[in-house]
Amino acid sequence: MSKIRSVRRRTGAPRQDEGPGTGVALLAGAVLGLATDAVVFALPREQARLLAGAGLAAASGVYLGFAVADGRRSALLVQTGELLGFTALAVLAVQRDSPGLLGVGWLAHVTWDALHYWSRGPTRVRSWYPSLCIGYDVAVAVPLLTGRL
């Protein structure tokens, strides 16, 4: 038998199945992301990029909150690393005035969300949250990646 096991089996981090379905959560996330875009577009460009960077750090912090609720040390350590990594990327992107790098950060966060959606992330999360976050992240990333922000 292989010594390599899936994260889900090793951590016992099943999704919790209360809440809206995947499609509803994706749509809700996209609507929230578009609402955020509307606010960001109303700001001067420098402030808009700062807000988009702070948003990426905040979105990463949500998973740390799930890790606190989860209570396992391993989840706390991994999610703290995730928060530090995405925050560092956001700071770098804002300092370099690089909306493209910030957009890449938001899309990279989609990967983190997908791991949790497929129950491969290290932390127990509500089943609907990764889908909501994916919809939001993509909606926020697109204007950054297309040069509209």
Locate the predicted segments by residue.
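Short amphipathic, positively biased membrane-proximal segments
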Residues: 1-149
